[in-house]
Amino acid sequence: MISIEGLSKVFSLNKKDIKAVDSLTLNIENGDIYGVIGYSGAGKSTFVRLINRLEEPTSGKVTIGDQVITELNKNDLRVARQDIGMIFQHFNLLWSRTVEDNIGFPLEIAGVDKQEKARRVKELIGLVGLEGREKSYPSQLSGGQKQRVGIARALANSPKVLLCDEATSALDPETTNQILSLLQDINEKLNLTIILITHEMHVIRKICNRVAVMEQGKVVEEGQVLDVFTNPKQLVTRKFVEQVMSSNEDSDISTIIENYPDGVLYRVHFLGETTNQTLISQIAKQFSVDLNIIQGNITQTQAGSYGALVVQVTGNESEIERAKSFIESQESVELEVIQHAK
């Protein structure tokens, strides 16, 4: 487990103290893909650099396993960093070295013999899907391929933790999804703990199981990704959730009521395991009502789906009431009546 207690970083600028990270406390379990999200200036990149002491903390404590990272001397820290891999937004590759030489560089520094280094590099090239690119230079690679080299290099010493600082921010959407899928695959194969820094909620949604939301150097909200999606408490969190939900339902409701005056209007919220397709199909088969899906958005997280549909239900009043009771009886579904039958 990674334990972070009261971690702070203060920078002095023009004789003023600026708290980039302010008394941050988190616990991250082994094997987690843990997302940290925030807008520019929230302190998230400073925070991740405090974990491996690329930035020295002003105060606080970082413990990884049974090692207190913040108390290590320089020599012990150098050894401990072999268990902490890191990838960056702009790849940080050595441009005069080939793919295989970039990946093997940490092994070279660690004094690994040539035969073992060659074996490990070949293994990593296969893991990240770069077969055939061994002799290529960074200038000959796409952005996604460069990041794959960065990931392989970060894994060279078989770390227990991988820090990802905006690792997909410089990539197009399709390549971003490919890199996220690769990270998820590596997490599952190696039981690697991943801490992922981002300003994009769809990155959190796609692969993270827990998330911390940072604002002005502090964690303002933290929890399971699905819980944060379904019940965001802070304004900054709601803004991030809107990135992936793209919902303007509230502003449209008056128009919907005006355009669909018949029957009943429900907003049905789906949480976790229940799928909208299954529920709507069951209602159509079991009850003598007509269903009209007017508006909706469903998104997937690692823990299940989340979203809402606005549905018009018309038919016999007793059948509408039976359908309503059926919806309310379902687990992981919440029903909100927007407009009663006239």
Swiss-Prot record:
Membrane listed as a keyword: yes
Bilayer topology: Peripheral membrane protein
Annotated localization: Cell membrane
Main location: membrane
Residues of the ABC transporter domain: 2-241
InterPro entries in alphabetical order: AAA+_ATPase, ABC_transporter-like_ATP-bd, ABC_transporter-like_CS, ACT-like_dom_sf, MetN_ABC, MetN_ABC_transporter-like, NIL_domain, P-loop_NTPase
Positions annotated to bind ATP: 38-45
Pfam families on file: ABC_tran, NIL
Enzyme class: translocase
A GO term for molecular function: ABC-type D-methionine transporter activity
Top-rank lineage group of the source organism: Bacteria
Entry similarity comment: Belongs to the ABC transporter superfamily. Methionine importer (TC 3.A.1.24) family.
Subunit structure: The complex is composed of two ATP-binding proteins (MetN), two transmembrane proteins (MetI) and a solute-binding protein (MetQ).
Job of this protein: Part of the ABC transporter complex MetNIQ involved in methionine import. Responsible for energy coupling to the transport system.
Protein name: Methionine import ATP-binding protein MetN 2
Gene that this sequence comes from: metN2
